Amino acid sequence: MNAITSAPAAQTVHVPLGERAYDILIGPGLIARAGAEIASRLKGRKAAIITDENVAPLYLDALVASLDAAGIASAAVVLPAGEKTKSFEHLMTACDKVLEARVERNGCVIALGGGVIGDLSGFAAGIVRRGVRFVQVPTSLLAQVDSSVGGKTGINSRHGKNLIGVFHQPDLVLADTDVLNSLSEREFRAGYAEVAKYGLIDKPDFFAWLEANWKAVFTGGAARIEAIATSCQAKADVVVADERENGQRALLNLGHTFGHALEAATAYDSRRLVHGEGVSIGMVLAHEFSARMNLASPDDARRVERHLQAVGLPTRMAEIPGELPPAEVLMDAIAQDKKVKGGKLTFILTRGIGQSFVADDVPASEVISFLREKHP
């Protein structure tokens, strides 16, 4: 880990994907610089901004002004906030706005929002005119460290989360750390679950650093930028090695198989559970299941749980408000998850902190038994 200095210097993470390479800029004041940064990289001078009703009042005017100053004409569509926006209905609304704005293939779609807006906007950018340029301006911690990087886009289906989508890499990611100051504590904590995930995958030193420095990350400044940059670099490394999720990129789904099932079980109701909270519970369950399978020490699961509890994240299914369906229904959601190949359950399990691996033949009977223990 880099030493923390008092001055929050901006950082750049480069994602080397050949002709589709791009930069992730991380630091304060980037929305004000967005127009100049986009104009220096893209030839088109038309943009469609896709945002939501929570983010638009805070940052849309500043983004439009920045684009105007750089000679980029823009039109915006404001969608409802929340996971349920990832639907065909709202996807078509977004696509219509891109076409209405006459954005050509050298123009761009700009996602101004959190993970939901980024996922939907990237999907729209990937299918309109068979692909237009795409810029991410993520406004949540979760989006800055996870969903804005890597090119996975999509919407939800009644069968599960993110099951319909395309790979469409952004041309630029502008992670303005100033916008994180407007997040609620719950939203920031939810994003932090994805930060911790990178340490648990294969960076034990980073996880230890987070255990020691998480309060500084929550406060802001240099520690926050360092945590975001380290997370983005970790994801970029995995994406470059396995862009289309044919192998090791699946490691990024640590905690997500259980987490997605819990999100589905709560009908994506953010009052009960948001994505990062599901991932938090899912990462603890993944470590506990690994211990049950004699792959890891129970002490590791307890260490993960202690840290996530310390930052205020839920770590147990019992902490989710309201009733959850029985283990068999959760198992059905797991089986529908996209991390299933040939009918075999694929989980990201662990041999210890920072020692995660892809297990592609997990017995369903063991999972059902485990879920019954955790959710009688």
From Swiss-Prot:
Keywords: Amino-acid biosynthesis, Aromatic amino acid biosynthesis, Cobalt, Cytoplasm, Lyase, Metal-binding, NAD, Nucleotide-binding, Zinc. Pathway: Metabolic intermediate biosynthesis; chorismate biosynthesis; chorismate from D-erythrose 4-phosphate and phosphoenolpyruvate: step 2/7. It holds the Pfam family DHQ_synthase. CDD domains: DHQS. Zn(2+) binds at E194, H256, H275. InterPro entries: Dehydroquinate_synthase, DHQ_synth_AroB, DHQ_synth_fam, DHQS/DOIS_N, DHQS_C. Belongs to the sugar phosphate cyclases superfamily. Dehydroquinate synthase family. This is 3-dehydroquinate synthase. It comes from Rhizobium etli (strain CIAT 652).
